[in-house]
């Protein structure tokens, strides 16, 4: 008598498993007590699809389409059904940005973080959609921790409230004693934000515009930052009061690097124990987030995505959240010792250093090339499985860094 094949319900999931998908599912389902199982499954499938696409070497202008992503989903269904599955995931109202922040923190830092690290917040525009990104510095790039996408015309109250809430949501996922050192650009130099961060005990560093008015200690007449005299190569530090009415006490660090068009005016909470040199070094890392935005738009092909409707921002947010794990894995692949062999094989270095390096390929590019070049793909696949096993044990991607970020020893005088 022939064995009858089990009859599958029409709506049953027909998943095409392999070692990579099993490891992805095992890693993500370990967090099923925090996040719905259906959401974790969809993130695993999208991660698998994007890694599959990485096996074809992508150029700097490689655009990505939702149709290409849907074709690579590990589902034993037709192309139309896979597209519908992807679209249902992007329209899932239960997938809010804040519920995945703890997962991203655990994947980036591990579950036993004991050091304070630099964290950057900045904003960019993707296809007309405003995008906020918070991430940790890693090998000249940023490990994504939190995203928030929005349309300016649809903001109900204030973008300032959205930014502050995103900062709080990210910071709340870290132990109090090792909360990251937040690095901000000039657009965030608001006294209201500084007061909030001080009251909440969150360390920060923010660059200010030269037109900002400050008051030196013991003086009643204020002056703009641009009126402070400084020569190229100099580094100065002052105790100041920020804002004419609030008079928020801050430390001002002015640095005029050689070859710079204008000085940096950096503000930190009053009494910060970091030296002026260390503060300047930390702010210099802010360029990492610009490189991170370029990665998402070009190497990952996000700028090629098209979303229709009056408010496409939530769908872009969910897709970026789903892309985060594949981005973390490719960064890790490009920052191992084995990646140095790939770099020597594919990279043509600059004759003159640019931004302090002669490299022309980022760790993300090296990670993607490891997957796509036949000469290195087998070893890269094994390393990928090994990374997923370590992530499942509570390790973080940041531990694969060849030159791990130095911990910030910080204390504030009360």
Give the ranges of each region predicted by the language model.
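Short, basic alpha-helical nucleic acid-contact segments in DNA-binding proteins
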Residues: 89-103, 108
């Amino acid at each position: 008598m022939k064995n009858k094949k089990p009859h599958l319900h029409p709506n049953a999931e027909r998943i095409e498993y392999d070692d990579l998908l099993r490891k992805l599912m095992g890693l993500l389902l370990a967090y099923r007590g925090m996040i719905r199982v259906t959401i974790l499954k969809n993130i695993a499938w999208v991660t698998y699809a994007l890694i599959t696409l990485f096996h074809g070497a992508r150029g700097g202008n490689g655009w990505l389409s939702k149709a290409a992503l849907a074709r690579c989903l590990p589902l034993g269904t037709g192309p139309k059904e896979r597209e519908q599955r992807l679209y249902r995931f992007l329209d899932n109202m239960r997938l809010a940005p804040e519920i995945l922040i703890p997962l991203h923190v655990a994947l980036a830092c591990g579950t036993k973080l004991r050091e304070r690290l630099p964290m950057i917040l900045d904003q960019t525009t993707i296809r007309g959609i405003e995008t906020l990104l918070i991430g940790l510095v890693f090998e000249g790039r940023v490990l994504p921790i939190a995203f928030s996408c929005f349309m300016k015309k649809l903001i109900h109250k204030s973008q300032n409230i959205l930014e502050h809430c995103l900062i709080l949501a990210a910071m709340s996922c870290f132990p109090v004693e090792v909360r990251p050192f937040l690095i901000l650009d000039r657009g965030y130099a608001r006294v209201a934000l500084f007061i909030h961060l001080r009251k909440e005990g969150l360390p920060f560093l923010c660059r200010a515009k030269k037109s900002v008015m400050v008051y030196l200690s013991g003086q009643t007449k204020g002056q703009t930052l641009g009126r402070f005299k400084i020569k190229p190569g100099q580094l100065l530090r002052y105790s100041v009061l920020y804002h004419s009415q609030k008079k928020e006490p801050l430390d001002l660090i002015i640095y005029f690097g050689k070859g710079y068009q204008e000085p940096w005016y950096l503000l930190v909470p009053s009494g910060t124990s970091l030296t002026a040199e260390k503060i300047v070094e930390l702010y210099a890392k802010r360029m990492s987030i610009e490189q991170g935005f370029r990665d998402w738009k070009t190497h990952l092909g996000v700028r090629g995505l098209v979303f229709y409707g009056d408010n496409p921002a939530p769908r872009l947010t969910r897709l970026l959240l789903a892309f985060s794990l594949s981005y973390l894995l490719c960064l890790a692949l490009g920052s191992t010792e084995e990646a140095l062999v790939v770099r020597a094989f594919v990279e043509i270095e600059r004759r003159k250093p640019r931004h302090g390096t002669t490299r022309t390929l980022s760790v993300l590019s090296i990670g993607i090339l490891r997957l796509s070049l036949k000469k290195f793909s087998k070893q890269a696949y094994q390393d990928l499985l090994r990374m997923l096993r370590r992530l499942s044990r509570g390790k973080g991607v940041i531990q694969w860094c060849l030159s791990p970020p130095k911990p910030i020893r910080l204390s504030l005088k009360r």
